Amino acid sequence: MNFKLIFLVALVLMAAFLGQTEGRRFKKFLKKVEGAGRRVANAAQKGLPLAAGVKGLVG
């Protein structure tokens, strides 16, 4: 019984103090993913017309 109470208090304290720092790290990670997605989308917009032109010439 006593162990459960100590575990619960420790869990609540960890959630209270560590929750804010994790949010910043997660946001920073998502910004990197968003930037990579934007680069892929831009490259696709530049490359797809070229690929369609080559397919039109070959096929």
From Swiss-Prot:
Gene for this protein?
Answer: CecC
The UniProt function text for this chain reads: Cecropins have lytic and antibacterial activity against several Gram-positive and Gram-negative bacteria.
Family stated for the protein in its record: Belongs to the cecropin family.
Q: Which Pfam families match?
A: Cecropin (PF00272)
The name this protein goes by in its record: Cecropin-C
Q: Sites of the modification Valine amide?
A: 58
Source taxonomy: Eukaryota, Metazoa, Ecdysozoa, Arthropoda, Hexapoda
Task: Give yes or no: UniProt keyword Chloroplast.
Answer: no
Q: Provide the leader sequence positions.
A: 1-23
Q: Which organism is it from?
A: Anopheles gambiae
* GO-annotated biological processes: antibacterial humoral response; defense response to Gram-negative bacterium; defense response to Gram-positive bacterium; innate immune response
Q: Is-annotated flag, keyword Ribonucleoprotein?
A: no
Q: What are the alphabetically sorted keywords of the record? A: Amidation, Antibiotic, Antimicrobial, Immunity, Innate immunity, Secreted, Signal
